[in-house]
Amino acid sequence: MEGQNKSITFDGREIRLTTGLYAPQASGSVMIECGDTSLLVTATKTAKKEPSDFLPLICDYEEKLFAAGRIPGGFMRREGRPPERATLIARLIDRPMRPLFPTWMGDEIQIVASCLSLDERVPADVLAVTGASIATLVGEIPFYGPMAAVRVGLIGDDFILNPSYREIEKGDLDIVVAGSPDGIVMIEAGANQLSEQDTIEAIDFGYEAVTELIKSQEDLLQDLGIKQIKPSEPEEDKTLPSYLEKNCTKPIELVLKKFDLSKEERDLELEKIKTETQSKIDSLKDDNQVKVLTSENEKLLHSDFKKLTKKLMRSQIINDGKRVDGRDLDEVRKISASAGILPKRVHGSALFQRGLTQVLSTTTLGTPSDAQEMDDLNPSTEKTYLHHYNFPPYSVGETRPMRTPGRREIGHGALAERAIIPVLPGKETFPYVLRVVSEVLSSNGSTSMGSVCGSTLSLLDAGVPLKAPVSGTAMGLIKEGKEVRILTDIQGIEDFLGDMDFKVAGTDKGITALQMDMKITGLPVSIISDAIKKARPARIHILEKMQGAIDKPQESLSPHAPRLLSFRIDPELIGTVIGPGGRTIKGITERTNTKIDIEDGGIVTIASHDGAAAEEAQKIIEGLTRKVHEGEIFSGVVTRIIPIGAFVEILPGKEGMVHISQLSEARVERVEDVVRQGDEVTVRVREIDSRGRINLTLRGVGQNNGMSYPEPTPTPVAPLN
């Protein structure tokens, strides 16, 4: 077997492409490699089974642990259900590919990207997105491509292309920009309160790089002698659209201009018009072409009626500057927000509502042991902030079985999570593991941004000292030829019938997250720039409403939340705290009824539902790890007797020896004549020898003049068993 090889030099790196060798029964395939990262991406098309008004596109991303030289855990020792990371990358592939296929095509298309080798310097996700375009092109599948994606990072004042995992972690920006020859089709970003202007410059920087990769794909097709197949829309029978335009335009326009209608009332009135139209068609003669068409295809009336409604709604926005609920283009829906709505057994809670979209968010404070371990190819080993988004069927007035979270729920949860991470306090300031759950109680657009707002409110209610509150809004777009209208705070029908869903989240200082999806084949940076700038006043307005509910963290935590103390010790003394076989740390936890976690860097976290117990454990550990100095006086307990002296525990786990000659001013024949095991004595540190051994004395020490660290008066310390 022979394949065709091509190398692309991009940003000083070599991207290697192999086509025609792997997966010969797929419509198209490519092995795309950079550094030691290798992905096999396939695109397969099968003929459509029945007419459809949506695109049956499936995008999958597979992570095999052998790609990182690892064997899966668990009894079966094989990969199970896809990890969250794989789901998010599958969505990252789907979102820029979907608008580049015509929905009328209807053929089933599946794109599968398999990560076969992973180099930590070369993240696989953007390679998978570009590989999806190449596999589709070489498979001669009709497609408005080529399409490519790049990641842009920001370190200091410099943008960098396709940063490594380490560079992403160090930087203030992680943005993926995907584009076609017509413009940008997808954006996914997390940022550290980056200004709007810097964000726009990063997008522009990324799209310039995207155009290079698009040109490379065009050159590849030319080298392979493949002519790209551009989708060609079949000629549409105008009989039914003309009939609907004549009979339904005015009734639909009247409904769209009734600005006081609720979503449900508007939907019912539109459905009534469609039902009446169906009755009129049924009364036509059997040989009438309109009746014949609708009889042959029951879905045709629904599809064409929806197209007419879409056309009229868009026309109203373009020509009149009015939306279906009467708002101006830049107007935000009515907002209400409240915090602390649930009993304090829930550590933090909030309800956020914007229009008919309503989200209940809750926050739970956990201990370090509650962190989520990551069993995937991401170099990060654990997550300490979790956001889970749930979208039950009742939120849209539907009934269906409630199952595990789908891709959409995972994606929305990840977006809201990314928006909050930049404002979370550091571990040493607030060492809790945090889990926020957002329950969508009612949906009419922008539930993910409602979850961002609800998350902020519930975190503050839980007492989390956020660096700044975060709000978010979804921006929309109507584009007809050269006429462009940007919409602020889109609702469901505007998302469904519009051209863009652009979610923008951030603080009053700058942006923390972006997510843009398109239904057209691309937009110039200038329009995206306008949308980002117009989102800012909306975000600030929403922030002000949120701060009316709660404007700072609660001063005290829920009485049902664990109490955590966090402090740092010398990493070289971690072994001292743990003790042989864990004896010392186990003794501390049993004695104080606490949980203790120690990180490799020396950060100690103590968890307890009793604050006093946590403080006691902290004192013990600080005593274990502090240095003892000559001349210090301690109150301690005699732990054992030997013929030449007695051992005294002066701090938890730290002993010194009193030589028999130092037990008294007078001569002592037997140690037991002065002290016995278990006696409390006051001793002074006489000497610390070259081996670190502590020599103590009772001579010249008044039994009522001692001190123990860190208290100013003697405090007996029982030995740890």
Curated annotation (Swiss-Prot):
Gene Ontology terms, MF aspect: 3'-5'-RNA exonuclease activity; magnesium ion binding; polyribonucleotide nucleotidyltransferase activity; RNA binding
Pfam families given in the database record: KH_1, PNPase, RNase_PH, RNase_PH_C, S1
Main location: cytoplasm
SUPFAM superfamilies per the UniProt record, alphabetical: Eukaryotic type KH-domain (KH-domain type I), Nucleic acid-binding proteins, Ribonuclease PH domain 2-like, Ribosomal protein S5 domain 2-like
Residue spans crossing the bilayer: none
Record localization: Cytoplasm
Keywords linked to the UniProt accession: Cytoplasm, Magnesium, Metal-binding, Nucleotidyltransferase, RNA-binding, Transferase
Binding annotation for Mg(2+): 495, 501
Top EC group: transferase
GO CC terms: cytosol
All copies of domain KH, residue ranges: 562-621
Biased composition (Pro residues): 711-721
Annotated EC: 2.7.7.8
Reactions mediated catalytically: RNA(n+1) + phosphate = RNA(n) + a ribonucleoside 5'-diphosphate
Annotated ranges, domain S1 motif: 631-699
Domain of life of the source: Bacteria
NCBIfam families from the UniProt entry: polynuc_phos, PRK11824.1
Family: Belongs to the polyribonucleotide nucleotidyltransferase family.
HAMAP family listed in its UniProt record: PNPase
Biological function: Involved in mRNA degradation. Catalyzes the phosphorolysis of single-stranded polyribonucleotides processively in the 3'- to 5'-direction.
PANTHER family: POLYRIBONUCLEOTIDE NUCLEOTIDYLTRANSFERASE, POLYRIBONUCLEOTIDE NUCLEOTIDYLTRANSFERASE 1, MITOCHONDRIAL
Protein name as it appears in the record: Polyribonucleotide nucleotidyltransferase
Organism the protein comes from: Prochlorococcus marinus (strain AS9601)
Top-level taxonomy: Bacteria, Bacillati, Cyanobacteriota, Cyanophyceae, Synechococcales
